[in-house]
Amino acid sequence: KLGEMRGKSYPEPMKLMGVENQRIEPIVGTDEVLLDVQNLTTRFPVKGGLLRRTISNVHAVEDVSFKVYKGQTLSLVGESGCGKSSAGRSILRLVEPMAGKVMFEGKDILGLNASEMHKARLDMQMIFQDPFASLNPQMQLMDQVAEPIRNYGLASGSELQDRVANLFDRVQLPRSFMRRYPHEMSGGQRQRIAIARALALNPKLIVADEAVSALDVSVQAQVLNLMMELQADLGLSFLFISHDMAVVERVSHQ
């Protein structure tokens, strides 16, 4: 509920009914800059006419600047269609910005070539709004969590299986779920799988794009608490994109 964090300086997990020995402590973070976005601009061309020429542009992100600190959460808040998701995708270069700088640990990632950007994505991952759409319905969950590790050649064989099993532990899912398929899971469980995939490469920054907006309130609280626990344990930074002010108030440092 909006206003519950009044008087508190840092994010704090929610107290859940029926959960014993729950860790409730503020998440402080550091004052060291991880991500420095400067004057980011992204526009999408609108084409028309017989030759399909560009006749105008949609100004999705216009001259946006902010900083994300190590171990902290910065939230981008706005109504649907305001460009906040485009900003998140632009930072990871899932869409290409037209102008600006995205300084990650002091290096402008907009100047990286394709192979350099592929390597940089080890440190930057994204969680999408719809976990069902972001998961392959024909793949077992263990293979989907293993996929980024395998693609980067970070582990194979029994070592890979152990890493995947540990990721299921991290997101508080039973290892017996590893051979299930997405349709066999609830919305909250699918989002935990999406979080496990994001964690697979040990990133420093996670862009969470409306990561809990498709979940009901009780499941939202569980997933948000999980994200805050992971932040406290792993020192993660989050760029949290949302339209829900009550959620933003709970998880944000800025």
What are the residue ranges of the model-derived segments?
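ABC ATPase NBD coupling module
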Residues: 51-55, 109-125, 151
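Conserved ABC transporter NBD signature motif
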Residues: 100-108
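Conserved ABC ATPase "signature" region
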Residues: 108, 159-176
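Hydrophobic anchor residue at the start of the ABC signature
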Residues: 145, 195, 207, 223
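Conserved ABC ATPase signature
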Residues: 181-185, 189
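Conserved signature/switch motifs of ABC ATPase nucleotide-binding domains
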Residues: 183, 201, 234
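A short, proline-enriched helix->beta-strand linker immediately N-terminal to the Walker B motif
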Residues: 200-204, 220
